[in-house]
Amino acid sequence: LDANRIYFLAADIESFETLRFELDDYLGSYNTDPLFAVFNRYRDRVIERIDYALGRLNQPFDFSANETYPFDRAEAPWAIDGAALDDLWRRRVKNDYLILKLEGKPHEEIVGTLRDRYQQQKRRILQISNQDVFQTILNAYMSAIEPHTGYFSPRATENFKIRMSLSLEGIGAVLQSQNEFTVVQRVVPGGPAEVEGSLRAGDRIVGVGQGDGDPVVDVIGWRLDDVVDL
């Protein structure tokens, strides 16, 4: 749920430890309530962080400070408290702002873009269905046993068929979600993306437009099926 360790606190992870040896028992008895409780905690933490990010947009940033924001936090320690997460997210929002500033965008446009992005992420976490949560639970469980095995909910199965059709016959690239980004998994030989030449495996898709002169929609934090629908 939190591969980059930017939402959960160390205390949250400690409280989940009891599930480490009980997960199979819960699934075997068809009792997923404790597992859904983990997701509910995750959703609460995500909303807390997004609300903080939205509030931080109303405050100035000090770009003279010598500090960094690490994108890959998979091996980082969990934040000890809310203050530690606040500092991490202050730098995260500052980095998001700086990226757009370096593109030459004015302050008002930057704040508007980031506000829309964060609000979109909040809407999406609130739209996650029970089917989505159950799929996440089963996939986490099965990946620990057999990494090449996965579970698709009925909705995910239908979306997968749509994605494969649109991605292969449309731009000619297979896409996947990695954290908040849509990433090109591979470019289909002979497809439009390979012929055009600018798209490569591993590229992150941060915006989608329909052609020259059309506005580019910021898709950071979007669900993969919604990105494909554009």
Give the residues covered by each predicted segment.
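PDZ/PDZ-like domain segments forming the peptide/carboxylate-binding groove
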Residues: N40, D44-D51, D62-R92, M164-D214
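Sec/Tat-exported extracytoplasmic proteins
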Residues: L1-F8, V46-L57, K122-S129, Y141-T149, ...
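Soluble non-cytosolic domains of exported or imported proteins
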Residues: D33-F36, N40, K105-G112, Q127-T136, ...
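PDZ domains, with a preference for the canonical peptide-binding region formed by the helix
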Residues: G207-L230
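Interdomain regulatory linker/hinge segments that flank or connect interaction modules
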Residues: E109-L166, D226-V228
